[in-house]
A protein has these predicted regions:
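Residue-level detector of conserved, well-ordered beta-strand and adjacent loop positions
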Residues: 27, 36, 177
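A short beta-strand-turn-helix
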Residues: 16-33, 57-58
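Hydrophobic, well-ordered secondary-structure scaffolds
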Residues: 4-5, 10, 22, 29, ...
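Structural alpha/beta surface segment adjacent to cysteine/selenocysteine redox centers
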Residues: 36-42, 47-126, 152, 193
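C-terminal cap of thioredoxin/glutaredoxin-like
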Residues: 1, 122-198
């Protein structure tokens, strides 16, 4: 659920939504539009969103996509937390392409709502040649994402924010607190880019 954002400083882009070293992202660093997704690998609506988001990524090579691992089901289903940590470690160790392959492979298992296994995670990690022995610590990154989600008023997944990479304001940012279609996401990208055509 989205409780709203305080726009008083007019600096949504400076809120931690823009890409930074610790957060997985895919797409050009100088993109004019950024799409940020908060997700949990065990969330069924995140799983339904995954193929829609994959379509949008392929259709928008000029947009930056930022992935905020937000394992809200981690206490109920430990694999949520394990998958999130592994994803962040792959990002830091192997980069954007390996991360996106891992991310999509986890969703491709079709295992959510408590069905994701350690074997699923290991297989997806092995496929991108992840070396667990040299994996960096990512707890600080997860804590930062959790704090940001709380600041934004997100308590569930998925949650998406589509914003221009510079000059974000209440007028050109779209917040989607829940599942959405590729078409609706594309409209939000066009809106953030300043394309007013309907």
């Amino acid at each position: 659920m989205w409780k709203g954002w305080n726009w008083h400083d007019g600096n949504f882009g400076g809120s931690g939504l823009q890409p930074h070293k610790g957060t997985p992202s895919y797409g050009p660093a100088d993109a004019k539009v950024t799409v940020v997704e908060f997700f949990d690998y065990q969330c069924i609506y995140c799983a339904r969103l995954a193929p829609e988001l994959e379509k949008v990524i392929k259709a928008n090579p000029d947009v930056r996509f930022v992935f905020k691992e937000f394992p809200i089901f981690g206490q109920r289903w430990p694999a949520s937390l394990s998958a999130a940590k592994t994803g962040l470690q792959i990002w830091k160790q192997k980069g954007a392409d390996a991360y996106l392959n891992y991310h999509n492979a986890i969703y491709a298992t079709g295992h959510n709502e408590g069905k994701l296994t350690d074997a699923d995670i290991s297989a997806a990690a092995k496929a991108v040649k992840f070396d667990a022995k040299t994996a960096p610590d990512v707890q600080g990154t997860l804590d930062g994402i959790n704090t940001l989600a709380q600041q934004l008023g997100f308590s569930g997944t998925p949650a998406l924010v589509v914003l221009p990479s510079a000059g974000a304001s209440a007028d050109n940012v779209t917040v989607i607190p829940g599942y959405t279609s590729a078409e609706a996401l594309q409209q939000a990208i066009s809106h953030a880019a300043g394309d007013t055509k309907k």
